[in-house]
């Protein structure tokens, strides 16, 4: 991701995944979320793909459009990270027993 460290890029991707999970949970399109939150649909797509560094105002607007507190989006990011760690542990255990 140009201009961002790998760690920063991962944060943006995790935030985007949290927004996408919230949107999917509501069963709404990127366009509908954009209409509710204010930014353009392509901006929402960029956020979900981890390509946009989201401002504090847009974090609040997206959260409100999803019907959640902004803090809950960050809590979801922790869950995503924990699930990735569990996945890597699982794969490591499989590798140990297979090889």
Task: Please place each PLM-identified region on the residue numbering.
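A short, Lys/Arg-rich alpha-helix, primarily the initiator
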Residues: 2-25
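Short, charged recognition helix plus adjacent turn
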Residues: 1-4, 9, 64, 72-99
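DNA major-groove recognition helix of helix-turn-helix/homeodomain DNA-binding modules
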Residues: 55-72
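Conserved hydrophobic/aromatic packing and binding residues within compact polymer-binding modules
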Residues: 19, 33-34, 44-47, 73
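Short basic helix-loop element that most often maps to the first helix and adjoining turn
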Residues: 17-36, 61
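Residue-level detection of the helix-turn-helix DNA-binding "recognition helix"
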Residues: 24, 38, 49, 60, ...
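Recognition helix of helix-turn-helix/homeodomain-like DNA-binding domains
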Residues: 38-54
